[in-house]
Amino acid sequence: MKPITPRSYALGWGAAFLLTLGACSPKTTSVATTSTTPPPTAEAAPATPSAAASFQIPVEYYTLPNGLKVVLSPDHTAPTATVAAYYNIGFRNEPRNRTGFAHLFEHLMFQGSQNLGKMEFIQLIQKNGGILNGSTRFDFTNYFEVVPAHKLETMLWAEADRMRGLAINQANLTNQQGVVKNEVRVNVLNQPYGGFPWLDMPQYANKNWNNAHNFYGDLKDLDAATLEDAQQFFKTYYAPNNAALAVVGDFEPAEAKAWVEKYFAGIPAVAQPPKPDLTEPRQEKEQRFTKDDKLATKPALAFAYHMPERNTPEYYALILLDQILLQGKDSRLYQAMVQKRGLTDDVSGGINYLGNAFNYAGPMLWMGNLTYDQTVKSDSVVSVLDQEINRLARGGIDQSTLDLAVVKLRSNLYDQLSGSDNFGRADMLASFALFDNNPARINTLEGEFRKVTPAVMQKTIQEYLRPTNRTVLIVNPLAKS
């Protein structure tokens, strides 16, 4: 897992919470082949970039009898294929007394399966010139592979092998408990601004335990995880009826459907426990907190506002307000805090620091953060934030400003969908399948934003960008500069 660096844009598909596979030093062992499809010979993956140009993306969506949601999106621009498996289990719905378990289990998924020994899944992709990774987010855990197109069947076989049965033993569990605890020490406990604000702010701003607990996990909880816990967690949450599979790239849909049926259809469904209640009460009073940081040399400040419910007109409006206020050097807050007043060198943030504005399911925060010199007062920073929001509220947002925000967002979104590895497309398709049962939303998103009116923008500012809906977290630096 890599430490999170807040991005300067809201829609990035960045490497948030990605498992660092390059440091795994895979063994040079052969791959077991008890499956009906033996792993093919190694070949280098071509690097031709994809050229997705619009939201008119091919989408074929269906559900297997065992409940697995499948999305196929052919793209013959480059001879590569991307496989993305998304499981509907993330930080928010991990067991109460097992904080950090969702992320711990992400690591266990690379420790071997029925037909692939420890590290052999990684070796299989790397030998075939591919790349792979996994991440743990608020509402899902995902795994993806990008390989030469003619290796697609092998990747589907391998991903199904993990879903069918994982090598969960005490040695693997103990080893990965140590790895995760070390990540906590390195990335949070022994790092200046460790966990700020992506890990800290949800704990201060939210009231519901599911949204507010330490996502990385308490070290005692990580130690307390038993082999039985891990086995039950896999059996429950890594079931086909709790997952979505997206396949994007250079393939023929009929052939890909046959492979998906061949390898995934026989995996049995498992009864799912009730989903936890993730709702947050309406915040009626501003909250301010201070966190001492013995390793930080400069003060830092983060602000957070509770988001509107996903897929509502106000939700789309706040995404556009984020473009106006916080995204890029032409944004209102950058201009006011950096260019005009010199309070900071940069201000960044967005919606969903562990992903983007679309790939989550529960409550979310719109956040921003910055560091500043000791001579700057935190009240001055908050005052400028209020001034810029009030300027929008008083002056209103005319149609031309709104149109510019849509164009800015559209450009950013298209950039992410045109990545050469097709992960941006796979991520959105799998997320929309998992949370909305409608991956074809990818082709109607721009239309949803164009429905937002200046009146809806004003309503959203008044309800969601009010000071009483805000949490402010200040880092008090204790280290000498």
Model features per residue range: what roles?
Residues 78-94, 100-104, 118-163, 194-220, ...:
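M16 family metallopeptidases and their MPP-like homologs
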Residues 48-87:
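Mature N-terminal segment immediately following signal peptide/propeptide cleavage
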Residues 45-60, 202-243, 255, 275-280, ...:
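Histidine-acidic residue clusters that define the catalytic metal-binding segment
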Residues 25-27:
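Bacterial signal peptide processing site
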Residues 14-19:
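Hydrophobic helical h-region of N-terminal Sec-dependent signal peptides
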Residues 45, 207, 240, 244-309, ...:
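An aromatic/glycine/proline-enriched structural segment found at the starts
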Residues 2-13:
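Bacterial N-terminal signal peptides that target proteins for export
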Residues 21-23:
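C-terminal motif of bacterial Sec signal peptides marking the signal peptidase cleavage site
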